[in-house]
Amino acid sequence: MAKRPAATSSNDELPFATEEPVADERSFFGGRPQNPTAPNARAALPASLSGPEHYHGHRERLRDRFREQGDTALADYEILELLLFRLIPRRDTKPIAKALIDRFGSLSGVFGAPAGLLTEVKGVGENVALDLKLISTVAHRTLKSEIRSKQVLSSWSSVIQYCHAAMAHETREQFRILFLDKRNVLIADEVQGRGTVDHTPVYPREVVKRALELSATAIILVHNHPSGDPTPSRADIDMTKVIIEAAKALDITVHDHIIIGKDGHVSLKGLKLI
């Protein structure tokens, strides 16, 4: 690491003692007078401090493309870059956006990643990670609103979209239940268990007990495969059949068991496994 230059009162020295961006906006947007005796002083600055024009012009061009042509004109990393403009206002966010996509594979992967993993990407601090998770939460709530107070079976694509957004990028298995009333309208959406990377414990008695507590007459089982492959295991199929039998004794219908992966989903009913 290069040794920091000592502070000096000479007008010929640059007023920066670090390679990190300066917090004061005036150093970026104010008209700092140049020392006429040091015409090359600006060139000696690190690229990150060489003035706003090296990325602010790019920001405006990117905004214009989005404004005029919509999201189809931008790559995923550029959409993320646009968002990061506001979260990290005085820094070139293009490398950060690309690093996030490279690390997590896609936009949905970025927003589905835990905050702790987001902060492992250079340039992403705790506040930025929190903001990204907040945006992710807004998206989840929006998708959930599409199935709330509606007949779930007639809004099946919305159900799949919501479950995928909520679970596809979880790093551990999660078992979720959608509880429905006699009109198949959503009563509650609850996570019943969280497990390891390849297993989560499920207790049929607890599933049925909770359905009775909510006066649900039907349920949809959902769980994720962190590996990304939604293919059901023998254990998945057997466990589903046990829950179906336990629920049937109390006139509760199990409509389906959906398995969510990063790139798709599987319906056990669709595969005629139940």
From Swiss-Prot:
Q: Which GO terms describe its molecular function?
A: metal ion binding; metallopeptidase activity
Biological processes annotated in GO: proteolysis
Write down the InterPro entries for this protein, in alphabetical order. MPN (IPR037518), RadC_JAB (IPR025657), RuvA_2-like (IPR010994), UPF0758 (IPR001405), UPF0758_CS (IPR020891)
Where the record annotates domain MPN, the positions are 152-274
Which keywords accompany this UniProt record?
Answer: Hydrolase, Metal-binding, Metalloprotease, Protease, Zinc
Binding residues annotated for Zn(2+), in chain numbering: 223, 225, 236
Motif interval(s): JAMM motif: 223-236
Stretches for region Disordered: 1-57
- One matching Pfam family is RadC
Source domain of life is Bacteria
Quote the protein name from its UniProt record: UPF0758 protein RHECIAT_CH0001935
Q: Which organism is it from?
A: Rhizobium etli (strain CIAT 652)
